[in-house]
UniProtKB/Swiss-Prot annotation:
It comes from Cenarchaeum symbiosum (strain A). One of its GO terms (biological process) is proteasomal protein catabolic process. It is found in: Cytoplasm. The keyword Cytoplasm applies. The active site is at 13 (nucleophile). This is Proteasome subunit beta 2. The gene is psmB2. It catalyses: Cleavage of peptide bonds with very broad specificity. The keyword Ribonucleoprotein does not apply. Keywords: Autocatalytic cleavage, Cytoplasm, Hydrolase, Protease, Proteasome, Threonine protease, Zymogen. Component of the proteasome core, a large protease complex with broad specificity involved in protein degradation. One of its GO terms (molecular function) is threonine-type endopeptidase activity.
Length: 210
């Protein structure tokens, strides 16, 4: 990857994903930056794909939104044709295919895909070339080196979703402290057997001080 392309992917943003025993937690900051310019301080980097699936976005906003639209379409189509939710692994493979088909003029995005299906919780990282990795925990963006410090210290294989919310929030909060491309608040979503839930400010404040 050239330095210029890598900078486009890594500059700005911190997103975190954690697979818990009973669900998946997705977390991200709210700052959109262009170089040293803060373009937006209320950016939603967590997107619902279906009732049982969501993703986080890092990289180019337009490219990421295009991918979200395609995934939502196919998730809805699967529900109609198969009378049920699309497996998370299938969504991850579809995302990989979208990236791979455009490798000549790649989408500038890095995706964390999480959800809860018949198999249970699942978390994947899909990069701009279509590589797919299943993860227990992962972070992307320019603040990821800082966030990994918190994740590697606090992650346990037996974390519940309630516990994982705190770990994810603390990881992104640490990145906000040390990374200029990360900031302006934190969003967090939980995906489990009850569906996709984006936490309110009051719910987040009940977990950690923001």
């Amino acid at each position: 990857m050239s330095n210029n392309v890598e900078e486009k992917i890594l500059h700005g943003t911190t997103t975190v994903g954690i697979k818990a025993t009973d669900g998946v937690v997705l977390c991200a900051d709210m700052r959109a930056s262009a170089g040293y310019f803060i373009a937006n301080n209320n950016t939603m980097k967590i997107q619902r794909i279906d009732d049982h699936a969501g993703l986080t976005l890092a990289g180019g906003v337009a490219d990421a939104q295009n991918i979200v639209d395609v995934l939502r379409y196919h998730a809805s189509l699967h529900r109609i044709r198969k009378q049920g939710p699309i497996p998370i692994k299938s969504l991850a493979r579809l995302t990989s295919l979208i990236f791979h088909q455009n490798r000549g003029y790649p989408f500038m995005a890095d995706i964390l895909m999480g959800g809860f299906d018949a198999v249970g919780p699942a978390l994947y990282n899909i990069d701009m070339f279509g590589s797919v990795e299943e993860k227990s925990y992962v972070t992307t963006g320019s603040g990821s080196p800082v966030a990994y410090g918190t994740l590697e210290e606090e992650y346990r294989a037996d974390l519940t979703a309630d516990e994982a919310k705190g770990v994810a929030l603390r990881a992104v909060k640490a990145a906000i402290t040390r990374n200029i491309g990360t900031g302006d608040g934190i969003n967090v979503a939980v995906i489990n057997g009850n569906g996709f839930e984006l936490l309110t400010r009051e719910q987040k404040k009940a977990v950690i001080a923001l």
